[in-house]
Amino acid sequence: MGPLSAPPCTQRITWKGVLLTASLLNFWNPPTTAQVTIEAQPPKVSEGKDVLLLVHNLPQNLAGYIWYKGQMTYLYHYITSYVVDGQRIIYGPAYSGRERVYSNASLLIQNVTQEDAGSYTLHIIKRRDGTGGVTGHFTFTLHLETPKPSISSSNLNPREAMEAVILTCDPATPAASYQWWMNGQSLPMTHRLQLSKTNRTLFIFGVTKYIAGPYECEIRNPVSASRSDPVTLNLLPKLSKPYITINNLNPRENKDVLTFTCEPKSKNYTYIWWLNGQSLPVSPRVKRPIENRILILPNVTRNETGPYQCEIRDRYGGIRSDPVTLNVLYGPDLPSIYPSFTYYRSGENLYLSCFAESNPRAQYSWTINGKFQLSGQKLSIPQITTKHSGLYACSVRNSATGKESSKSITVKVSDWILP
């Protein structure tokens, strides 16, 4: 059988996609016949055009042949088959409507797409001739001629030594390998430069001026290679981490005025203050000079302990300080005595406890009818009698704030017994 040319293309299609190239793989060389080969015509085909998978040197006495997509002869890879007797054509599950098989076993693929790239298997069956028949498999691979790649970046303006960058070589190309270049040299592997499993993605950790680029990526397959235009990262100056200075870390509630200062000072920065992870809202209580680097908090309360952070920003981004939390001294508040009931019977046990909000913890003392009894939060008198009736007072004191407070209850003890 002579070669069969693919039908001429009557419409000219401008190539915008990927060229497809056939690489030839030769198989099965029976001793009395010429070598069977498969080639693509044309050798390079544009996406949207037609390609003929032309078969040479078919053996004689054929019963038929089957084309499969891929290297496996599974049913769902079955494209089409040709039966010599009756010249019948049968289509399989992998038939797309664009394939046409000829009597010489050649396969025409029309309107080629990128999905058509890859391996094809021709299954040849000879008639039974006393030896049970002969079956041969012939495989070739249709490669994508690599397009010119481009590099996409997660961040073209990284902060020096502070930010990571992810570079990706586009497009994703089947059956191709990826290679990266930096400063015109093959990419060195360091702890700052790491590649993905496919090499298509490059991770740059903590970009410095020495690894800012230019970067290029290359897409390569067995028939071609293409390199991208260079991409250089615009390295931004490093922002030094700010810190907060404060005139008093242990202010007294409603008494001390606090002044926070965000360091360092620079005309190139914008300053932002944060409280409890939220941007500090404008409030009449909070005073901020026009540059916002200083924060003045008069009459601090226990609800304003923080944490506080300051942030410095330039037009590309910002960085926050470590948090600062205040130790606001307060109290003691008016104490509470538990339990609150005041009537007891003779012989009962008396247990009283006292509590007052205070920072640091308050000192407690008890008096009965003005006479000191003990120091501590709890007062216990077993088997009380009527002589224990009187005014019980809990006094609390905070040595840090210098404040004192007290609470009293009247306890009445009776010999009266319920019937």
From Swiss-Prot:
Q: Does the keyword Repeat apply?
A: yes
Task: Name the Gene Ontology biological process terms.
Answer: female pregnancy
Localization per record: Secreted
Query: Which residues belong to the signal peptide in this entry?
Result: 1-34
Query: What Gene3D superfamilies does this protein's entry cite?
Result: Immunoglobulins
Q: Which residues form the Ig-like V-type domain?
A: 35-144
Q: Which CDD domains match?
A: IgC2_CEACAM5-like (cd20948), IgI_hCEACAM_2_4_6_like (cd05740), IgV_CEACAM_D1 (cd05774)
Q: Which residues form the Ig-like C2-type domain?
A: 147-234, 237-327, 332-410
Q: Which UniProt keywords apply?
A: Disulfide bond, Glycoprotein, Immunoglobulin domain, Repeat, Secreted, Signal
Disulfide links within the chain: 169-217, 262-310, 354-394
What InterPro entries does its record include?
A: CEA_cell_adhesion, Ig-like_dom, Ig-like_dom_sf, Ig-like_fold, Ig_sub, Ig_sub2, Ig_V-set
SMART domains in UniProt: IG, IGc2
Coiled-coil blocks = none
CC per GO annotation: extracellular region
Sugar-bearing residue positions: 104, 111, 199, 268, 299, 303
Entry's family note? Belongs to the immunoglobulin superfamily. CEA family.
Q: PANTHER family under this entry?
A: CARCINOEMBRYONIC ANTIGEN-RELATED CELL ADHESION MOLECULE 19, PREGNANCY-SPECIFIC BETA-1-GLYCOPROTEIN 4-RELATED
Q: What is this protein called?
A: Pregnancy-specific beta-1-glycoprotein 4
Source organism per UniProt: Homo sapiens (Human)
The coding gene here is PSG4
